[in-house]
Structure formats: structure tokens, C-alpha cells
């Protein structure tokens, strides 16, 4: 939602369908439906809301604790309730109302307790680019992967644009070692794969 008109990463770039949940729901519903007709999977973003922020998470830490409100959840709630969303992307924003320690992408409270349990989302949760500075300047690769996966993220995004390129082998090896050391549950990985496989069957 385009809440903060001075927001330079979402609002001034025209990356939102409107200022109100009514506008966002109306126009994004049309967009999602047309994509579906073309067998294209749509992704709602950036959960739990980025339109009220004052900073850009590509560049560093973004705190929305004083600007965010629950009305930013309304479009997500609508799409989930009406079973019209296959994927949601997390935001790298920090909100102490939702988690006192971690930004949303790395937060179990946001991605599992709020999104899964409270709102009832059962689709695929994908991270935003994990090399954006809001994450990569504060967490190393092992910490990022462990926290993101354990928070409930099913699909990890590395764009290799903002930081030193990371290979798939590095990611897989790191996750594998964390499973062996019982820092990540194998069941969590299996469940994530099941969600992704289920999504791909819809194409």
C-alpha cells in the first residue's frame, strides 16, 4: 500500500496499486487474474508491508515500527481468505511490534506465527533478495540461511547484484552442514519442497 508518499523504493516508483486496501485489492485482483489466465504465478509483496517505510532495504536497515499499521495486512488477508494467492514475498523490514530482534524475512514470529497461523497462508513464501544490505550487512551467509529457513521461508532468493556472488554449491553446502549440526530441521526442508512442488503442479 502506498501509505508514505515520500517512500522512494515503493511509492514514488509506482510499485503499489494504491493508497488504500480497497484500491490495492481491486487492481491487484485484476492483475493476478490476468496473469493466471496466461499460466503465470503471481507473488504478493512485500509482507508484512513496505509502503509506509522511510528507507530502502536495498541500502540498509529499515525500521517501520513507528509507521506500519495493521491495515497493511488487509490485502494479504483478502487474498488468503479467498484462496487467490500462491506466493508471498517477505520484506527485509524491522518492526518491533511484530519481532523485537529480527527483520521480517528472518522472523519466525512474522513468517510463521502471523502469516501461517494467524492469516492462514499455506502457499510458498519466498524471500526478497538476501544480498540486499538490510540483510547482508548484518548477517553472514550461515546466519541468513538458518534464520530465514527456520522462520518459515520456503524459497531463498539470491540475485547476485548487490554483493559478492554466491554460488548454489555454497548455499547447499551451508544448509547441509546446518542440518547435520541440527540447526535446521530436515523436515523443514522437506515441507518447503512439498509446497514448491505443489505450486509447480498448478502451471
Model-derived features with residue positions:
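Active-site microenvironment of metallo-dependent hydrolases
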Residues: 203
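Second-shell residues forming the walls of enzyme active-site clefts
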Residues: 23-178, 183-187
Amino acid at each position: 500500500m502506498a501509505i508514505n508518499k515520500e517512500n522512494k523504493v515503493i511509492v514514488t516508483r509506482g510499485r503499489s496499486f494504491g493508497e488504500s486496501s480497497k484500491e490495492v485489492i481491486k487492481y491487484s485482483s485484476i492483475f493476478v487474474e490476468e496473469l493466471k489466465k496466461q499460466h503465470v504465478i503471481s507473488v504478493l509483496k512485500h509482507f508484512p508491508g513496505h509502503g509506509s517505510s522511510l528507507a530502502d532495504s536495498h541500502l540498509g536497515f529499515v525500521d517501520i515500527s513507528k509507521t506500519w499499521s495493521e491495515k497493511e495486512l488487509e490485502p494479504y488477508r483478502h487474498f488468503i481468505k479467498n484462496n487467490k494467492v500462491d506466493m508471498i514475498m517477505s520484506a527485509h523490514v524491522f518492526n518491533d511490534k511484530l519481532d523485537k530482534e529480527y527483520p521480517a524475512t528472518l522472523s519466525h514470529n512474522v513468517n510463521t506465527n502471523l502469516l501461517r497461523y494467524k492469516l492462514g497462508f499455506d502457499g510458498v513464501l519466498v524471500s526478497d533478495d538476501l544480498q540486499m544490505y538490510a540483510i547482508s550487512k548484518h548477517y553472514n551467509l550461515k546466519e541468513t540461511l538458518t534464520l530465514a529457513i527456520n522462520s518459515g521461508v520456503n524459497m531463498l532468493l539470491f540475485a547476485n547484484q548487490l554483493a559478492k556472488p554466491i554460488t548454489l554449491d555454497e548455499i547447499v553446502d551451508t544448509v547441509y552442514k546446518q542440518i547435520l549440526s541440527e540447526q535446521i530441521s530436515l523436515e523443514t526442508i522437506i515441507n518447503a519442497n512439498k509446497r514448491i512442488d505443489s505450486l509447480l503442479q498448478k502451471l
